[in-house]
């Protein structure tokens, strides 16, 4: 399971012109689900998202996590993160989870997040979304919890 984390001043996602999720300062996390991922990967990825230190402390060092700051978390499904781009000029989506598994694990991740953090907002799985953000820094990190072998 993959998360592309972006520290934001604000972020929002719209579907058909309607805002379905928005946060102030916090993390926009684009989420990709890979074949073979399980609920264990989702739980570990959430632990890393909430605990990853990408906010500055009083000394200006990135020593604070989202759990420390209480900022917003916007989770947006993005299956293209699981693409294989090593060859040619077109991505292969073979590594991406089938839509049913992808939706189930994204929903599980959201449920876990809502049970331990607030505020949490989300995009819509399978929808064409317009995502807007103000990247703070910019600070962007790629986190991955590989599927079991």
From Swiss-Prot:
Gene name of the encoded protein: dtd
Protein origin, superkingdom: Bacteria
Catalytic activity: glycyl-tRNA(Ala) + H2O = tRNA(Ala) + glycine + H(+); a D-aminoacyl-tRNA + H2O = a tRNA + a D-alpha-amino acid + H(+)
Coiled-coil stretches: none
UniProt source species: Thioalkalivibrio sulfidiphilus (strain HL-EbGR7)
GO MF entries: D-tyrosyl-tRNA(Tyr) deacylase activity; Gly-tRNA(Ala) deacylase activity; Ser(Gly)-tRNA(Ala) hydrolase activity; tRNA binding
Function: An aminoacyl-tRNA editing enzyme that deacylates mischarged D-aminoacyl-tRNAs. Also deacylates mischarged glycyl-tRNA(Ala), protecting cells against glycine mischarging by AlaRS. Acts via tRNA-based rather than protein-based catalysis; rejects L-amino acids rather than detecting D-amino acids in the active site. By recycling D-aminoacyl-tRNA to D-amino acids and free tRNA molecules, this enzyme counteracts the toxicity associated with the formation of D-aminoacyl-tRNA entities in vivo and helps enforce protein L-homochirality.
InterPro entries: Daa-tRNA_deacyls_DTD, DTD-like_sf
Placement of sequence motif Gly-cisPro motif, important for rejection of L-amino acids: 137-138
Annotated localization: Cytoplasm
Keywords associated with the record: Cytoplasm, Hydrolase, RNA-binding, tRNA-binding
Family: Belongs to the DTD family.
GO biological process: D-amino acid catabolic process
Enzyme class, UniProt record, top EC level: hydrolase
Its EC number(s): 3.1.1.96
Comment on protein domains: A Gly-cisPro motif from one monomer fits into the active site of the other monomer to allow specific chiral rejection of L-amino acids.
One Pfam family named in its UniProt record: Tyr_Deacylase
Assembly and binders: Homodimer.
PANTHER family: D-AMINOACYL-TRNA DEACYLASE 1, D-TYROSYL-TRNA TYR DEACYLASE
Name of the protein in its database record: D-aminoacyl-tRNA deacylase
One GO CC annotation: cytoplasm
């Amino acid at each position: 399971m993959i998360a592309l984390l972006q520290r934001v001043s604000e972020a929002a996602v719209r579907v058909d012109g309607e805002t379905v999720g928005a946060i102030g300062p916090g993390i926009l996390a684009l989420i990709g689900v890979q074949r073979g991922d399980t609920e264990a990967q989702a739980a570990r990825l959430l632990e890393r998202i909430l605990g990853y230190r990408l906010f500055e402390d009083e000394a200006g060092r990135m020593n604070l996590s989202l759990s420390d700051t209480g900022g917003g978390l916007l989770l947006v499904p993005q299956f293209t993160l699981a693409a294989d781009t090593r060859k040619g000029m077109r991505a292969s989506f073979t590594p991406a989870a089938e839509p049913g598994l992808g939706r189930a694990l994204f929903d599980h991740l959201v449920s876990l997040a809502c049970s331990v953090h607030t505020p949490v907002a989300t995009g819509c799985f399978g929808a064409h979304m317009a995502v807007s953000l103000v990247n703070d820094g910019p600070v962007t990190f790629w986190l991955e919890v590989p599927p079991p072998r």
